[in-house]
Design a protein with these regions (language model features):
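Conserved catalytic phosphorylation-site environment of P-type ATPases
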Residues: 288, 347, 382, 395-469, ...
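Juxtamembrane coupling segments of multi-pass membrane pumps/enzymes
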Residues: 2, 74, 183, 189-191, ...
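Conserved ATP-binding TGD loop and adjacent catalytic N/P-domain core of P-type ATPases
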Residues: 16, 29, 266, 430, ...
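Conserved cytosolic catalytic loops of P-type ATPases
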Residues: 26-49, 53, 198-199, 230-324, ...
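Transmembrane helix-loop-helix hairpins at the membrane interface
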Residues: 85-239, 350, 451, 715-720, ...
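Membrane-embedded alpha-helical bundles of multi-pass transporters
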Residues: 109-123, 152, 156, 171, ...
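Flexible metal-binding regulatory segments at protein termini and peripheral loops
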Residues: 1-124, 149, 247-250, 332-340, ...
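P-type ATPase nucleotide-binding
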Residues: 448, 452-580, 592, 604-620
Length: 831
């Protein structure tokens, strides 16, 4: 995808013209132009010079953006250079317009005195209005230059409508002035007064002034849509304190190199990404993650640019600088996403391509019809001019991109990063969320959940023995016990003769006494385990936990249960999704017992266990038949499933936000950010619908009103000046409505509503993979296949004796024990 800057566009018709011109070039696969960011994305092998030439031939300017878009370049592109220019034009226009209105209407409506020179000097009055309105037109010559260029190139735009409306009023008034001069020479005072009433000089000037008012309001509001992005850029520190030969010195941020040591005092911003090498502190990372609670940082922990050091003094080694920092990557992602086009924008694009020519045609027909009905030339032209100036393709062109821009900004402030506009729109349509278990629903690291001691043995004594034994082990379950004990300041005794017995447990000596830890089969060899303790252990296992038994000598001490526990916000997030009408499914490669236990704790109703990575992809594709599916994972191991879903969400990215396979990147490891993503997507989609409705309904009502269609029914007719005022406000209203997205609370479920789906056949199919030993030939495959497919709930079985596996497609959940028994009864072994 190659990006270009495009200049000279004023409305949606310009966008359609540029896209049409570029799409005709050989080698261009797709072209997307954004009116809001004045940018163009082109996919294909076409030469950039050919693309730039095509844009120029269409009447616009184009230049190639740098391959590596620097944050400084993005910041420059977001600077509001348009509003100050428009403001100057507007002030000059209003000053001249005030004088014009004084001469044309002030003396009649307000009784303001005119210089005696103008008494009965109608020609002088007309000439003054001609000159003053001409000055306003010169001040706003941009409309005429752009508008008439569009006509010459057969690509009329919004400026064309304004130029035709104002120009027609001016030309007609000038002709009326000449006719009045002739009448005055002939002494026909009645004709003089009649022609005086045909002057529309003030309308010609007022149209330009009011359109300029609207353009300024629009430019100001458009600037507000990028506030979130600008806010991120302002966070980037300009200087850093680096340590050289033990001395600290402040340098510009550009001089910091990878590997430099930098110091950060309390209250200062961290200048670049790095790792703490000295000291400890609490860092506020809300700028990047939206999380206001400070995060403790110790030696070895990573820190990110633009986060705030709140307490201690720390020294860090720079690991990412310049455009590689997390902040710069986030800025680039938000900027790139805002420059892309959502599929829903195609509605406006199709209309915009024919909108301006259609309006010009309607205006001409309007004038002709009123003339044929016997109305005066002035009346007929007034109706045609009203049609020209009230029609607004700008609102259509801005309806989608402004909402996308604001939505992306809101997401960035909350640690939700969308790769493009398509991702944001798709998030609003999601009705099924597939969750990976490990690291997504659960924390991804084992933790102690239960401690069961025998009579006369305290928890402290059990933990002391357990930690003494486990601290020498590298097993994840051992680490969980050590962390648990350390948190409670329990230190185990030193051990000797430590030995890890593969598949069973651990053994060592404390002093002269042997201690053991491991599974039931191993520990029961050394100590008697009562039935009550064994029953408790089995109950813990049913809950998806791993019971570890410990004994000292031949005395059984107790059980410590360890499990990968669900995240604190896991249950709440799942319930929020359900309340939003979203179907939640958990896919995991773990065994069914563990998966069901985790799902029960997280309130997840649908579970598919024992699924290999390629099986996850198949399940996701199956679910896509029934709706829009989002796949949520915490790592790239599930990339096939991530890319096969309608929306791939990577959770807990931290500083690695540039994950190619994901459509949405969640910086924090919070499951609550998943419903927040969908909530934001829905709010943005709803806002786009509102904008498109307003843009369409405005023209649907406004154009017939301007034509005079309601004059005979209600006596309603629209003065061209009021038409210009309405046009100037239409785009402003669309942009202002988009700004309301800034008030969306993405983590609040207060206003959640269940989405209404079309009646769909409920999808109950799931896949499961079994490992089977003993199959030697196709005959064995057929036997196993027939056996499995005879089980109620198994729709089909793909069996391979070469792979030693069977992939089952099931219409309902079937217990592993049932499947295992059937296969083993047929003479084969299930692993």
């Amino acid at each position: 995808m190659t990006q270009y800057n495009v200049t000279g566009m004023s409305c949606a018709a310009c966008v359609a013209r540029v896209e049409k011109a570029v799409s005709k070039i050989d080698g261009v696969n797709s072209c997307s132009v954004s009116l809001l960011t004045n940018s163009m994305n082109v996919d294909g092998s076409a030469d950039s010079s050919a693309i730039i030439k095509a844009v120029q031939n269409a009447g616009y300017g184009a230049s190639l953006k740098g391959k590596e878009k620097k944050s400084a370049d993005v910041e420059d592109s977001l600077k509001d250079t348009e509003t100050p220019k428009i403001r100057k034009r507007l002030i000059a226009s209003l000053i001249v317009l005030a004088v014009l209105m004084y001469f044309s209407m002030g003396h009649m409506m307000c009784g303001l005195p005119l210089p005696s020179f103008f008494d009965n000097n109608h020609i002088a009055m007309g000439l003054v209005q001609l000159i003053l309105s001409g000055i306003v037109m010169v001040i706003n010559q941009k409309f005429f230059v752009s508008g008439f260029k569009g006509i010459i190139r057969l690509a009329p735009n919004m400026d064309t409508l304004v130029a035709l409306g104002s120009g027609t009023a001016f030309v007609y008034s000038t002709i009326a002035l000449f006719m009045m001069t002739d009448a005055q020479v002939r002494g026909d005072l009645a004709a003089v007064m009649s022609y005086m009433h045909e002057f529309y000089f003030e309308s010609a000037a007022m149209i330009l002034a009011l359109i300029t008012v609207g353009k300024m309001l629009e430019a100001h509001s458009k600037g507000k849509t990028t506030d979130a992005l600008k806010g991120l850029m302002k966070l980037a520190p300009k200087t850093a304190t680096i340590v050289v030969d033990g001395a600290e010195k402040t340098v510009p941020i550009e001089q910091v190199k990878k590997g430099d040591i930098f110091a950060v005092r309390p209250g200062e911003s961290i200048p670049v990404d790095g790792v703490v090498i000295d000291g400890e502190s609490a860092v506020n990372e809300s700028a990047l993650t939206g999380e206001s609670v400070p995060v403790d940082k110790l030696i070895g922990d990573t820190v990110s640019a633009a986060t705030i050091n709140q307490s201690g003094y720390i020294r860090c080694e720079a690991t990412r600088i310049g455009e590689d920092t997390t902040l710069s990557q986030i800025i680039k992602m938000v900027s790139d996403a805002s420059a892309t086009k959502a599929p829903i924008a195609k509605i406006a694009d199709r209309v915009s391509g024919v909108f301006v020519p259609a309006v010009i045609t309607i205006a001409v027909i309007t004038a002709i019809v009123w003339l044929l009905l016997g109305q005066s030339v002035g009346f007929s032209l007034a109706r045609a001019i009203s049609v020209l100036v009230i029609s607004c393709p700008c609102a259509l062109g801005l309806a989608t991109p402004v909402a996308i821009m604001v939505g992306n900004g809101v997401g960035a402030k909350n640690g939700i990063l969308f790769k493009n506009a398509v991702s944001l729109e798709t998030a609003g349509r999601i009705d099924t969320v597939v969750l990976d278990k490990t690291g997504t629903v659960t924390k991804g690291e084992p933790a102690v959940t239960d401690i069961v001691t025998v009579e006369n043995i305290s928890e402290t004594e059990l933990l002391k023995t357990a930690v003494a034994l486990e601290k020498s082990s590298e097993h994840p379950l051992a680490k969980a016990i050590v962390v648990y004990a350390n948190d409670r300041h329990i230190i185990g005794d030193a051990v000797t003769e430590f030995n890890a017995v593969t598949g069973n447990g651990l053994t060592a000596k404390i002093g002269s006494e042997s201690v053991y830890g491991g599974n039931y089969r191993y520990i029961s060899q050394f100590a008697e385990i009562l039935s009550d303790e064994k029953a408790k252990a089995e109950q813990l296992a049913e809950e998806g936990k791993t019971p570890l038994y410990f004994c000292k000598g031949n005395k059984f001490l107790g059980i410590i249960a360890v499990a990968d526990i669900i995240k604190e916000d896991g249950k709440q997030a799942v319930n929020e999704l359900k309340n939003m009408g979203v179907r939640v499914v958990m896919l995991t490669g773990d065994n069914e017992k563990t998966a069901k236990a985790v799902a029960k704790n997280a309130d997840i109703d649908e579970v598919v266990a024992g699924v290999l990575p390629d099986g996850k992809e198949k399940n996701v594709k199956e679910l896509k038949k029934y709706g829009k599916v989002a796949m949520v994972v915490d790592c790239i191991n599930d990339e096939p499933a991530l890319t096969s879903a309608d929306l791939g969400i990577a959770i807990g990215a931290g500083t690695d936000v540039a994950i190619d396979a994901a459509d949405v990147v969640l910086v924090k490891s919070r499951l609550a950010d998943v419903p927040a993503t969908i909530r934001l997507g829905r709010a943005t989609l709803r806002n786009i619908h509102e904008n498109l409705f307003w843009a369409f309904i405005y023209n649907v009502i406004g154009i017939p009103l301007a034509m005079g269609a309601f004059i005979n029914l209600f006596g309603w007719q629209l003065n061209p000046m009021f038409g210009a005022a309405a046009m100037s406000l239409s785009s402003f209203c669309v942009v202002t409505n988009a700004l309301r997205l800034n008030f969306v609370k993405v983590h609040s479920s207060k206003h959640d509503r269940k989405i209404k789906h079309k009646n769909k056949k409920e999808n109950k199919t799931m896949e499961k993979t079994m490992k089977i030993e003993g199959m030697m030939c196709p005959h064995c495959e057929a036997t196993v296949k027939k056996t499995l497919e005879s089980i109620d709930g198994v729709e089909s079985a793909e069996v391979s004796h070469e792979k030693g596996s069977a992939v089952l497609t099931m219409s309902k959940n079937v217990e592993d024990s049932v499947l295992k028994k059937a296969v083993e009864d047929a003479g084969y072994k299930v692993n």
